[in-house]
Amino acid sequence: VKAAGLAFNRNQILQYYMIFGGVPYYWGFLKKGQSLSQNIDSILFEKDAPLRDEFKYLYASVFKKPENYVKIIEALGTKKVGMTREEIITSTKIPNSGDLTTKLEELESCGFIRKYNAFGMKKKNAVYQLMDSFTLFYFKFLKSEPTDEHFWTNQINTPAVNTWLGLAFERVCMEHVDQIKMKLGISGVLTEVNSWYCKSDPDHGVFGSQIDMLIARKDQVINLCEMKYSQSEYTITEKMDRSIRNKISDLIIVSGTKYAIYPTLI
């Protein structure tokens, strides 16, 4: 960005990364003299925008027969926490075979999805989650083919964009676990990074929780990470404090973990 002479601040650079990730090709479309929102409109939303139809070409450029890859991606795009293999089969109607395994492995190796094990669950119940920044943005804003050529400029600070910013920031955090560990001072500690969720069970004192990132450490500590996007200094509210306490309680009750749990705000 600096080399191109673009006068963007850290937050604007982050927002562009949330859309396109770190792929250099996409960063080459930014133009000097335009604001970030003007750039995004000219790159994605104007009538002849160069990347308006990028989704059509993205998977076709990587895979010879992209149809079933796209089916998997579209299925995963409907569920934030991801899907198990069985759920993918049910949603896509793709047969349970070695070919499906290959497709999932290829999507993972290309960085489109990630495979993780929910904390405390067996490996056979692995979850596949959509991670590609542009694909997530496409499903949220481009798939409906908006006709407003100034769509992004006119959507700033709307609930839809603010919700997307929060979700996109979570994905950025998941892509930068090594940097988060370094900041926490645990770079040398062996860890597993998981997500976790449980349903409400009032009879057993379980509130029902979704934790997008747990860093389970070899030194018997779990960093329960809350990832919050904010353009100003973030203040923990009473509601959020109660939510974090409920998540800690649920994790202890449902998983039976004996690890110390450190709430960690990112």
Q: What are the language-model segments listed below?
A:
Residues 118-121, 126-266:
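A cross-kingdom feature that marks ATP-driven nucleic-acid transaction machinery
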Residues 64-81:
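Short amphipathic alpha-helical interface segments
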Residues 79-91:
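Short acidic, hydrophobic short linear motifs in intrinsically disordered regions
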Residues 2, 17, 87-90:
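The alpha-helix within a helix-turn-helix
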Residues 4-58:
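Amphipathic alpha-helical "lid/sensor" segments that cap RecA-like P-loop NTPase cores
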Residues 108-119:
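A short, conserved structural fragment
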Residues 11-14, 24, 38, 67-70, ...:
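Non-catalytic, well-ordered alpha-helical scaffold segments
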Residues 93-110:
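Short amphipathic alpha-helical interaction segments
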